[in-house]
């Protein structure tokens, strides 16, 4: 069993937000100026079947969990690797289940299928499908942040951007393309993986404390997004045409 102690903590109870004050977007340059944060709780790597029961017993105590997965990156078209890691986090502790070592344990599949426990992820359908290839189960009460953030005025869909919009802090994505099938996870990989699962949980908890926009407000925001996207496309076409004219003149 492998423990990692992190150095920062972001407590939902310490955050006071006014409802409907989130900006719809944040650009990459603005994110780079934000202070870096990461999960500072206990990280436990599960790489032997004997560790699973205790982890499942702990996780079953909670009604909301943050979930994320990782797979070995592929740099060839059409080549995909199976899910290598599933991270399940509370605010204080994150378990990293190494599926290359323990498969998808039945106890964890039962948590994912338990309607009494809310599981929160991002692009969650892809994660769930990957996990079901390890062991089939019927997912229940799984919430995808991408399907709900627009109700709070947030149009960006990436985890780093959503987190930055809500908390004004940056989470690192530097370990995303590392090899998750290595014999041992590095401390940097463990920190990255736990931070992603924890971040989804924290985002959900804050949104649950925030009054959503009305349906009319959401539709108006979506329409504004479509118009802005169309304007950007027209500007890009105009620049391309201008460049072609300059080349031909």
Question: Model regions: which residues?
Answer:
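N-terminal accessory regions of nucleic-acid-interacting proteins
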Residues: 10-65, 134, 145, 198, ...
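Conserved DEDDh/DEDDy metal-dependent 3′-5′ exonuclease domain
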Residues: 44-47, 60-64, 73-173, 177-192, ...
């Amino acid at each position: 069993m492998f423990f990692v102690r992190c150095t920062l903590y972001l407590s939902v109870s310490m955050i006071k937000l006014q409802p409907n004050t989130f900006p719809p977007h944040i650009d990459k340059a603005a994110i780079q100026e934000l202070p870096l944060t990461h999960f500072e709780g206990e990280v436990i790597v599960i790489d032997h079947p004997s560790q699973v029961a205790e982890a499942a017993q702990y996780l079953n105590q909670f009604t909301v969990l943050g979930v994320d997965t990782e797979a070995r990156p592929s740099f060839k078209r059409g080549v995909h690797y199976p899910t290598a890691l599933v991270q399940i986090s509370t605010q204080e502790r994150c378990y990293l289940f190494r599926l290359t070592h323990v498969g998808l344990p039945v106890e964890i599949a039962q948590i994912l299928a338990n309607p009494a426990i809310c599981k929160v992820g991002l692009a969650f359908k892809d994660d769930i499908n990957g996990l079901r290839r390890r062991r089939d189960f019927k997912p229940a009460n799984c919430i995808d942040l991408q399907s709900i953030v627009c109700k709070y005025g947030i149009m960006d869909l990436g985890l780093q951007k959503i987190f930055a919009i809500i908390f004004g802090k940056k989470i690192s994505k530097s370990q995303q393309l590392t090899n998750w099938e290595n014999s041992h996870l590095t401390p940097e990989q463990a920190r990255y993986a736990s931070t992603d699962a924890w971040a989804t949980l924290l985002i959900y908890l804050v949104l649950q404390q925030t009054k959503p926009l009305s349906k009319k407000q959401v539709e108006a925001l979506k329409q504004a997004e479509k118009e802005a996207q169309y304007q950007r496309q027209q500007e890009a076409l105009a620049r391309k045409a201008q460049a072609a004219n300059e080349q031909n003149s």
